[in-house]
Amino acid sequence: MPVVSMKELLEAGVHFGHSKSRWNPKMAPYIYGVRHGIHIIDLNKTIVMLEDAYHFVSDVIAQGGEILFVGTKKQAKDIIKEEAERCGAFYVNERWVGGLLTNFQTVRKSIMKLQTLERMEEDGIFDVLPKKEVRNLRRKMEKLRKLYNGIRDMKKLPDVIWIVDTVREKIAVSEARKLGIPIVAIADSNCDPTVIDYTIPGNDDAIKSIKLLTSKIADAVLEGKQRRESAEEVVPTKERRPVEITERERQLFEQAVEMSEKYAELDKDSTEYE
């Protein structure tokens, strides 16, 4: 049974891309067509490619790997935190600090500095320091928490990275590629899928779409951990039988596209999606 159903994808609006004028031609293989000036993403391909991504993530985790969730735009940040915490993954949902991966040891020093400040507060050292100095230390501590709280226990580089909006998170993409860390990501119609190792064609702006796809990756992490604990033999993703799209699901998708008149006024480039 597929990881996700056509009905789930349609209800979450995963098929809505950006306006035609904003597309990246490299996404052409994943575009079904255009409706009212908006690219429609081919969900038949989304189902198959999400399946591959899901099993890849599960395999990595089952073999003892770790994953980092990344998404800093406002409609993604809360979802990234919630789903990462649900599956026990590391996450970045505020601002990507340049060098977070490529200069990881320096980042670790900043995290150690945060831990030192927290110990000072717990041990009552702040109580005997001048108020002005304490204010400055607390301000510094909060800034470090905001930046690094989701990775404070990450002792080494992640083995895979999940990204929502590779255009916005281009620095994270660049660093991961430089280090050879596999990228699993949503590819909206304005993205370059060639920088992604496991592409999931879909809407990376709508909250429901982000939630659905991120939750599936979190589910893959949980499954991988369960397999690791049960010492299940890992079957490489490439050896799995590919998922097949049923005729019923194909028809459901085509009907939904044809009925998209009611979305004629939808403008993904409006402030609703900023």
UniProtKB/Swiss-Prot annotation:
PROSITE patterns: RIBOSOMAL_S2_1 (PS00962). GO terms for biological process: translation. GO terms for molecular function: structural constituent of ribosome. It holds the Pfam family Ribosomal_S2. Keywords: Ribonucleoprotein, Ribosomal protein. Gene3D superfamilies: Glucose-6-phosphate isomerase like protein, domain 1, Helix hairpin bin. GO terms for cellular component: cytosolic small ribosomal subunit. NCBIfam families: rpsB_bact (TIGR01011). Belongs to the universal ribosomal protein uS2 family. This is Small ribosomal subunit protein uS2. It comes from Aquifex aeolicus (strain VF5). The lineage of its organism: Bacteria, Pseudomonadati, Aquificota, Aquificia, Aquificales. The gene is rpsB.
